[in-house]
Amino acid sequence: MAQLHDYRDRYYDGSGGGWHPLTNFNKSSTASGRIDLGRKKGREDAANIISNLARDKNNNIVETIKIITHSMGGAYGNGFVQGLKDYIKTLPIEQQKQIKITLVADFDPYGAGDIIADPDIKTLQFKHKNDLNIFGMGWLANENESGLSKENIRTNTGTSTDHSIFTFFNDISSLSEGTYKWNGSKWEKQ
């Protein structure tokens, strides 16, 4: 994650083990199921994630948490954030104030219509849309997440409309490191 100057990244399988329609119908097959799986994992890993955040010489947390998702991972990541926040609420108030989730970036989130963006966190959605791009699956993930303004949803209908994460490198390069704050009408970088 050099783009965000974050070198202690973690990777999770947001599909919950994959979708296998011919062999089973598990939680991973629906957005709500993946949200539940993500929330459980977020709660489970929160203490470890927080204990490993960078600190200054006074032991104050100086590193932020950023969530980057793709496809089925969008719903999983949404639940993961909920799980992190559930855990953070159990901590002393002074520590809660130090822990910041500063960005969620969802790339072609599958089932986005069932995702409600957290209003306390800057969230960006990137989509590649082309219903005629059959083999590149440009038709697959074209719903908007609830709670996002039009300026936080970026849709490419031209140069690249494939669903693959590899086609989102230009979008990834637009992500900006920093902390964002809601000013009442839009997110502002601090």
Go through each PLM region and give its residues.
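C-terminal catalytic-base region of ester-bond hydrolases, centering on the histidine
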Residues: G18-S32, I116-Q190
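Active-site catalytic motif of lipid deacylating hydrolases and related acyltransferases
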Residues: M1-V62
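Sequence-level detector for tyrosine residue identity
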Residues: Y7, Y11-Y12, W19, Y76, ...
